[in-house]
Amino acid sequence: MRTMNLAGMIDHTLLKPEATEKDIVNLCHEAKQHKFATVCINPAYICTAAKLLHGSGVGVATVIGFPLGATMTEIKVQEIFAAKAHGAREVDIVINIGWAKSGNWEAVAKDITRAVEAAHCCGVTIKVIIETSLLTEEEKQKAAEIVKASGADYIKTSTGFAGGGATVEDVRNLKAWVGQSVKVKASGGIRSRETALQMVEAGADRLGTSSGVQIITV
């Protein structure tokens, strides 16, 4: 089982709309203390987190087109450039879920490919959220194929805002569909060490959770 450096696989996450600047400061202190991979926060707090985490080895991740994915592609691209300029090292972007459910896969692919190109142009790691709880198995596989073809760094299960999170089955399937060329981030509902380890065993390379401290200290 891949359990080495579990803390280094965690995106310490706080995306609640009611999160205060004090909450973000506390999140960053926890991330530095436990050496998490990143903090994952809303874009308005990138500068705050970047200053607090400078030189710590903990990265700043933010979200793009979040949580619905229905933002215009041009806006997603500008969000990526702005995130980089303010200090983000990684971005988690949501596919246009409505297009996916409509079977408009060409539009989904164009949207994600442009975002990936923008991210890589400015040296940012990009994770593509497909919102597994809203897709059929066939749609999940098609989305995974598009993410793989786009050249994205990660495929991510969930936003955590759509009523369902990561499952072991989804993580295992996504890993099988994208192979070794794309990493997998499991996110949503990961609140215990046991669940975290199950996700890693299924193929997750990164874990998105607001329960990181609890996971690594029990």
Swiss-Prot record:
Catalysed reactions, as listed in the record: 2-deoxy-D-ribose 5-phosphate = D-glyceraldehyde 3-phosphate + acetaldehyde
A GO term for molecular function: deoxyribose-phosphate aldolase activity
Alphabetic keyword roster: Cytoplasm, Lyase, Schiff base
The EC number(s) this enzyme carries: 4.1.2.4
Domain of life (superkingdom): Bacteria
Catalytic residues as annotated in Swiss-Prot or TrEMBL: D92 (proton donor/acceptor), K156 (schiff-base intermediate with acetaldehyde), K185 (proton donor/acceptor)
GO biological process assignments: 2-deoxyribose 1-phosphate catabolic process; carbohydrate catabolic process; deoxyribonucleotide catabolic process
Pathway: Carbohydrate degradation; 2-deoxy-D-ribose 1-phosphate degradation; D-glyceraldehyde 3-phosphate and acetaldehyde from 2-deoxy-alpha-D-ribose 1-phosphate: step 2/2
SMART domains: DeoC
GO annotations of cellular component type: cytoplasm
Record keyword Lyase present: yes
Compartmental location: Cytoplasm
Family: Belongs to the DeoC/FbaB aldolase family. DeoC type 1 subfamily.
UniProt xrefs under NCBIfam families: deoC (TIGR00126)
Protein role: Catalyzes a reversible aldol reaction between acetaldehyde and D-glyceraldehyde 3-phosphate to generate 2-deoxy-D-ribose 5-phosphate.
Protein name (record): Deoxyribose-phosphate aldolase
Lineage: Bacteria, Bacillati, Bacillota, Clostridia, Eubacteriales
